[in-house]
Amino acid sequence: MFVTFEGVEGSGKSTQMTRLCAALEAAGRTVCRTRQPGGCFLGQTLRAILLSQKTAGLDDRAELFLYLADRAQHVAEVIRPALAAGQVVVCDRYTDSTVAYQGYGRGLDTTLLQNLNAVAAAGVVPDLTVLLDLDPAIGLTRATSRNAAAGTAEAEGRFEAERLEFHQRVRAGYRALAAAEPARFAVIDAAPSPDAVAEAVWGVVGKLL
């Protein structure tokens, strides 16, 4: 089973992934927790480039192809082998992030992005995509505070530095994607307490076990 988590910055993906992975392991499943970018050796290097505020001037198309390179290698090196071994793969961001951020956020052609995603993903499609839906203004406050506390504002804060309007477009993109594929997406309100959100996530994932 392949589960992906999507959402705007600060939507709580890391927290909910931790809880879901623990619940899956308690249910006797072997879990591969991973992320894009950064889920493989190449991805770690690309992540440092993509998220750093030092690369604020990165061209939108260059940004896109770095994400696609990460995805292609990550699928081949991590995701596909884990699925073949019968593991439950839980991934922080996947193809939908590219459409939401580089498409709706940056303004690149979404049809082109879907086609490029298909090449990079090589047929590996999530069984379930959990979209943690949150007002971007709230999410940015959370994410900025998190990075400040961790001392990662410069190293991992490039997207948090974008204007609120950018993140509003990203959210709208996610909602459009979810509306187009209701069978794959589970849209969960990320505003309530972490416990309440975790319960909602498990309510969806548990049905697929």
Curated annotation (Swiss-Prot):
SUPFAM superfamilies found in the cross-reference section: P-loop containing nucleoside triphosphate hydrolases
N-terminal signal peptide: none
Binding site for ATP: G7, V8, E9, G10, S11, G12, K13, S14
Cellular-component GO terms for this entry: cytosol
EC code: 2.7.4.9
Known role: Phosphorylation of dTMP to form dTDP in both de novo and salvage pathways of dTTP synthesis.
Family: Belongs to the thymidylate kinase family.
Entry protein name: Thymidylate kinase
